[in-house]
Amino acid sequence: MELEDLYSFKIIDDPQISNDGKFIAYTQTVASKQYNNYRSKIVIYEIGTKKIIHEVTDDYKNCFPRWNINNELIYLNINKENNNYSIKLFELYKKNCKLVLEQETSISDIKISGCNNYISFLKYDDDYLNYDDDLKEEVLFLDRFSWKSDSLGFTGNSYNHLYVYDLKNSSLKKVTDGKYDISGYAWSNKGSNIAIVTNKSSTNDFERKKEIYYISNLNHSENNKITEFEEIRGNDISFSPNDDYLTVCGHDTKEYGHYGLQRIWLINIKEKKKICITENIDISFGDYSRNYDLKYFGGNDKIEWSRNGDEIYALSNEYGYIFLNKININTSKISRIFENKSVIYGYVFDEKEEKFITLEATSNDPANIFIYENGNRSKISGVNDELIGNLDLKEAEEVWFKNDGIDIVGWVNKGDKIFDNARPLILYNGGGPGGMRTNTFVFEYQYYAKRGFTVMNCNARGNYGHGEDYSLAIKGHWGDLDVSDNIAFLNNYLN
């Protein structure tokens, strides 16, 4: 296995099922060695024939596929060379593309309104403070604390805001404005109401707190604050089928910080009241896998409602794996949709809730799309199967051990070479902690194992997956208990 094998892997992301349940659209991304960039295409798969029927592709990135009610595909075309970000519409049956809207700066989180009359997205403002200054090549002027991001890079003094494009009138409107970021939002199922996740406090750069506002009129920026939470890490929000309730994942205990579990909350919009429906379920919900690799656009990991209004679907973080569940909002009864030994980091389903599409990774396969229907589960992609076979990539060994009387899980990618009568070993202690270390694909783990190094990593205390006490254990003991767990893992394996 060589480092350049990384260019041969295909990254699968963001599956979306059409409204009639007949088609799946997803992105497939490759790293181009020739052009030193990423290129993405949208693949359209027909469920009935089990065949790929079309690919939306060019020399750039085509991503964020979103189906409208007419089985047309709204998507984003990114041409960074020309600073062009175009929202386009692909007519499936005519195999025809139309330009809807162009922007000169990056946009994200594209959605279609429930009434189908609007397209929305998030976009960072221009950083005017550093726009025309003579010193801009030498000096960075800042008036906000959060001027960079681990995922986005440099954002400067910009704030992320919500824009809505009126398809009937061909007009674009900036819905929110001010010194705050919109971190998540959702359209109501009927009409054109929006719920947003933000923090409008003047000290928002220094707070984990998130607020939820309800926008009932797109022509007025005054919003109706519904409630707030001490933390919402995922920033995903959903309306109930009748639009009376919202669901989010988060916690409301300030002293827990980012160690608190992301529990599921039900919010009554009219009464502005919230209730935690998973208070007695010791699980964090959403995708919080933190050691994944070869994930580019990700997938839908938010709470989704059943059409009956009494149940929701949610991803759960448990002992290094992520499962898809159904939860009754009245009884809090939770049940898995199917059993799996993988990391599910995206899912969608059809309107009849008969077909469940999941995006999954394992320790020797970065991503595949599965369909679960009528009790049967099958893989519908497999773009890396031949490469995985040729490289002979092995699954990691799962190892359970104890430290301080606590059960901890870890994984080992075994190397098979001996150097000078010794077997070299690499122990990854992870970052954070926070989130959950999972039994998922990491290119460098496989690469080092092929080079003869045994590679180890574990879900030490401070992470999700083993309950809230486990996650809170290192609060005030950061660098102590988590390091102790890693060393105990090493000693246990060596012994």
List each language-model region with its residue ranges.
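Beta-propeller fold detector
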Residues: 53-56, 98-101, 173-176, 223-227, ...
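Conserved beta-propeller blade repeats
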Residues: 9-24, 57-74, 104-122, 149-154, ...
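Beta-strand-rich domains and repeat architectures in extracellular enzymes and scaffolds
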Residues: 4-40
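Cap/lid segment of the alpha/beta-hydrolase catalytic domain
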Residues: 283, 383-495
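Short loop/turn segments that connect beta-strands within beta-propeller blades
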Residues: 47-50, 91-95, 166-170, 216-220, ...
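Predominantly five- to eight-bladed beta-propeller fold
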Residues: 39-40, 124-163, 210-211, 261-267, ...
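Asp-box/WD-like beta-propeller blade repeats and closely related beta-sheet repeat scaffolds
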Residues: 83-117, 122-154, 159
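Short, solvent-exposed loop/turn segments at conserved positions within beta-propeller repeat blades
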Residues: 34-40, 80-85, 153-159, 204-210, ...
